[in-house]
C-alpha cells in the first residue's frame, strides 16, 4: 500500500503542478519526491509502529503544505490512514488518545494560524473579505468543518475497529473455553 501511495503521490504532485495549485506550475522534483517518500514510506510500518508512523506522516504532511508542494489528495489519504491506524492498533488506549489529541491540536493550531495569516495579509486577489459572512469567511469555515469531520471520522473509525477486534478476540477465547468445557463434559459422561 505504501508503494502504491508513493506512486500516486508523485503523479498527484505532477498533476497538481500542471493544474497550477498554489498558482505555480513549477516544482522542484527533488522536493516532490522527498515529500512523497516521507509521506508514504512510513505507512509500511503502520501496524508495527502506529504512533511513530502517525507522527512522521503528520510532520511530512505539515512540511509539504508549508513548502507548498502541489499535492493535496494523497497527503490527506496518508494522514487519514496513519491517524486511523493509531486508533485501530494501539492497545494502550491512553497512548492512542494522547498521540491523536497531540496531532489534532497541532493540525488545528496550524490551521488557525494559517487562517489568521491569510485573513490579515493584504491582497487584491481571491475571495471577497467584505462582510461578516463573506465568501472568504465561508471558505475558512468550510476548511475548519472539513478538518473536524476528517479527524473526527478517523478517530471514530479507528476506535470502532479496535473495539471490533477486541470483541472478536474475546469471542475466540470464549469459543476455546467452551470447547474445553465440552471435552471435559464428554470425558465425564463416559
Identify the residue ranges that each predicted region occupies.
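Subset of alpha-helical transmembrane segments and adjacent helix-loop junctions
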Residues: 27-30, 50-56, 63-79
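Hydrophobic, membrane-inserted alpha-helices
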Residues: 35-42, 56-64, 79-83
Amino acid at each position: 500500500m505504501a508503494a502504491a501511495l508513493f506512486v500516486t503521490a508523485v503523479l498527484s504532485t505532477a498533476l497538481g503542478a500542471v493544474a497550477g495549485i498554489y498558482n505555480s506550475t513549477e516544482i522542484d522534483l527533488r522536493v516532490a519526491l522527498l515529500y512523497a517518500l516521507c509521506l508514504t514510506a512510513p505507512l509500511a510500518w503502520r501496524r508495527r509502529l502506529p504512533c511513530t508512523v502517525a507522527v512522521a506522516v503528520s510532520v511530512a504532511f505539515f512540511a509539504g503544505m508549508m513548502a507548498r508542494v502541489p499535492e493535496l489528495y494523497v497527503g490527506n489519504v496518508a494522514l487519514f490512514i496513519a491517524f486511523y491506524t493509531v486508533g485501530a492498533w494501539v492497545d494502550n488506549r491512553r497512548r492512542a488518545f494522547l498521540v491523536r489529541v497531540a496531532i489534532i491540536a497541532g493540525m488545528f493550531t496550524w490551521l488557525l494560524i494559517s487562517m489568521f495569516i491569510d485573513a490579515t495579509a493584504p491582497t487584491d486577489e481571491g475571495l471577497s473579505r467584505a462582510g461578516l459572512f463573506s465568501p472568504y469567511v465561508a471558505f475558512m469555515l468550510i476548511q475548519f468543518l472539513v478538518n473536524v469531520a476528517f479527524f473526527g471520522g478517523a478517530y471514530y473509525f479507528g476506535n470502532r475497529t479496535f473495539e471490533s477486534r477486541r470483541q472478536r478476540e474475546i469471542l475466540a477465547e470464549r469459543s476455546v473455553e467452551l470447547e474445553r468445557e465440552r471435552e471435559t463434559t464428554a470425558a465425564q459422561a463416559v
